Amino acid sequence: MSDTTILQNSTHVIKPKKSVALSGVPAGNTALCTVGKSGNDLHYRGYDILDLAEHCEFEEVAHLLIHGKLPTRDELAAYKTKLKALRGLPANVRTVLEALPAASHPMDVMRTGVSALGCTLPEKEGHTVSGARDIADKLLASLSSILLYW
């Protein structure tokens, strides 16, 4: 495709418009990721996502995002064991999933499953950072179970 396009049945020439509205403007500060520091790149906690995608397992990247660092071999094994133990779904969540139409979109199923999980296992008021990480681990472990059960 060229930089200019002629509309069918028209003499008008249009040019693609580059979106520059927020180009170079920080949208927020986070320790989790940086976007576009050196072009069209994305880094998670300082690691280039292309390197992570090529060299890491899913659980390693999840550990990096949730717990702040890449795990050692022993930490990774323990983390996988923890996630496996958290995969179970409460009966109330299974009942909600059973009521969903078979033609539902998987994203809608996950959203509904997470909502049911939140109602069944509500967060405590004023939980700690460690408690927030436990919640994230439970959600991470539950998403595949939600889809597979449905």
Q: Over which residues does each language-model region extend?
A:
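Hydrophobic alpha-helical bundle cores within soluble ligand-binding/oligomerization subdomains
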Residues: 2-150
